[in-house]
């Protein structure tokens, strides 16, 4: 209702007894119909909050989730502790990871990549909105289209299994950003293999049931990993480093 009337919740509360005009009723009913058909509200409104900031979103990018905030916060701690300067964000989507990092790390050099040109355009628009200057954007399938290395590679890649049951609302999001293959972990495993000689650290969000396959893939690639949980207590990601890279203890 607030969105349909273009007013704040506080103003809506003060106008509870006001009668809607026919135009306002029509707008509200159209909004309800779109929601009933499974269109995410974030696509209707065109915005979504992430780490306290309002990012532009549309049907070409995934809707940011709170789980990814955990990934960004953990990476920020590592980057600051290790004084890393070169960062790569794989599958940037709307740019939430790269931009959130750039705003906290103005001296870092960040490369944000995505396979989707439409997603990259959205990320560029968000970077412009926040006045971020230290991000470059590139179309790439994982690490295949460039040779640049990084101190840390960060990714929230597609990791859902092809046959996993999803709500209509989620199915309205781009499949390119949702599904990681038949099992769901194929893209993650491929990324780990590609990152082996390209970074000191690799940090990824993963599916709740993918810890075992990630442990195997990371070990085979020479990474030593720590896994972390989301707010619901499920395994949700890992922070890995090449074993011969010396950690700085804070």
Regions found by a protein language model. Give the residues of each.
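Generic structural signal for residues in well-ordered beta-strands
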Residues: 55, 135-137, 225
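Conserved Class I SAM-dependent methyltransferase catalytic core
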Residues: 182-241
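Short, basic, low-complexity termini and linkers enriched in Ser/Thr/Gly/Pro
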Residues: 80-81, 86, 242-250
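Short loop/edge segments at beta-strand edges and connector loops
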Residues: 45, 139-140, 206, 229
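Conserved AdoMet
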Residues: 2-77
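Conserved SAM/SAH cofactor-binding pocket of Class I
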Residues: 67-163
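Mobile active-site "lid"/loop adjacent to the S-adenosyl-L-methionine
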Residues: 159-187
């Amino acid at each position: 209702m607030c969105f349909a009337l273009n007013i704040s919740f506080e103003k809506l509360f003060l106008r509870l007894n006001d009668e809607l005009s026919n135009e306002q009723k029509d707008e509200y009913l159209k909004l309800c119909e779109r929601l009933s058909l499974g269109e995410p509200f974030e696509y209707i409104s065109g915005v979504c909050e992430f780490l306290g900031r309002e990012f532009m979103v549309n049907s070409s990018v995934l809707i940011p989730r709170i789980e990814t905030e955990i990934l960004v916060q953990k990476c920020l701690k590592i980057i600051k502790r290790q004084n890393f300067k070169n960062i790569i964000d794989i599958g940037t989507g709307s740019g939430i990871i790269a931009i959130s990092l750039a705003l906290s790390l103005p001296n870092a050099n960040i490369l944000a990549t995505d396979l989707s040109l439409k997603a990259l355009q959205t990320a560029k628009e968000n970077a412009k909105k926040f006045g971020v200057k230290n991000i470059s954007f590139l179309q790439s399938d994982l690490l295949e289209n460039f040779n640049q290395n990084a101190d840390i590679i960060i990714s929230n890649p597609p990791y859902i299994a092809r046959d996993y049951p999803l709500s209509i609302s989620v199915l309205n999001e781009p499949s390119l950003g949702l599904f990681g293959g038949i099992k769901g972990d194929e893209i993650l495993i491929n990324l780990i293999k590609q990152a082996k000689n390209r970074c000191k650290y690799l940090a990824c969000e993963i599916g709740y049931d993918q810890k075992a396959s990630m442990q195997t893939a990371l070990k085979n690639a020479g990474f030593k990993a720590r896994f972390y949980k989301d707010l619901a207590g499920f395994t949700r990601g890992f922070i890995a480093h090449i074993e011969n890279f010396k950690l700085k203890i804070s």
